[in-house]
Amino acid sequence: MKRTYQPHKTPKKRTHGFRGRMKTKNGRKVINARRAKGRKRLAA
C-alpha cells in the first residue's frame, strides 16, 4: 500500500509558504496571528 504523504517542495511552498499565505486575506490573517503569538517561524 502506498503511503499518504509523498513530499514535494514546490506544492508545499505554494500552499504553506510565506508568499502563498500573503496571497489571500485569510492567509494574511494566519501570518498576523502567528506574529501576535510570537512564533519564530511564520510560514513553512
From Swiss-Prot:
Signal peptide residues on this chain, from the entry's feature table: none
Region annotated Disordered, chain positions: 1-26
Gene Ontology MF term list: structural constituent of ribosome
Pfam families: Ribosomal_L34
PROSITE patterns on file: RIBOSOMAL_L34
UniProt KW Magnesium keyword: no
Keyword Ribosomal protein applies: yes
Keywords linked to the UniProt accession: Ribonucleoprotein, Ribosomal protein
Gene Ontology CC annotation, any one: ribosome
InterPro entries for this protein: Ribosomal_bL34, Ribosomal_bL34_CS
NCBIfam families: rpmH_bact
PANTHER family: LARGE RIBOSOMAL SUBUNIT PROTEIN BL34M, MITOCHONDRIAL RIBOSOMAL PROTEIN 34 FAMILY MEMBER
Protein name: Large ribosomal subunit protein bL34
Annotated source species: Campylobacter fetus subsp. fetus (strain 82-40)
Phylogenetic lineage: Bacteria, Pseudomonadati, Campylobacterota, Epsilonproteobacteria, Campylobacterales
Record gene name: rpmH
